[in-house]
UniProtKB/Swiss-Prot annotation:
Homopentamer. GO terms for molecular function: mechanosensitive monoatomic ion channel activity. It comes from Hyphomonas neptunium (strain ATCC 15444). This is Large-conductance mechanosensitive channel. The chain crosses the membrane at residues 15-35, 81-101. It is a multi-pass membrane protein.
């Protein structure tokens, strides 16, 4: 039973999948940092100094200075700024994945388009003999 599990676990596809999950998690962290630390500050500055992560609506009618203050006060809030950041992260992740898959598909097509190898010399000779025999009959 252990041998079967070992064969299953070490198959190329399963190992590739595990590596993909690990790299995906790491890439997700990079994309989140790209959105929150690189893209959103200049975008917020262009929008009048707004930090998108701090955009929220207080549902109890009380106004709070920031999302942190509202959360600390226990107020129910809709943190739509965090949602905007998440949507932008998703779009960037989806675009990156699209380009990776598109590149892989292009490479696969190039591999498939390679001409088939020449038949072995024996086959060529046998075909010639067959053709000569058919011609003489």
């Amino acid at each position: 039973m252990f041998k079967e599990f070992k064969e299953f676990a070490l198959k190329g596809n399963l190992v590739d999948l595990a590596v993909g999950f690990i790299l995906g998690g790491a890439f997700g962290t990079i994309v989140t940092s790209l959105v929150n630390d690189i893209m959103m500050p200049p975008l917020g500055m262009l929008m009048g100094g707004v930090d998108f992560a701090d955009l929220f609506i207080s549902l109890n009618g009380t106004e709070y200075v920031s999302l942190v203050a509202a959360t600390e006060a226990g107020a129910p809030v809709i943190a739509y700024g965090k949602f905007i950041n998440a949507v932008i992260s998703f779009v960037i992740m989806a675009l990156a994945l699209f380009f990776v898959i598109k590149g892989m598909n292009t490479l696969k097509k190039k591999e498939e388009a390679a001409p088939p190898p020449a038949p072995p010399r024996q086959e060529v000779l046998l075909e010639e003999i067959r053709n000569l025999l058919a011609k003489n009959q």
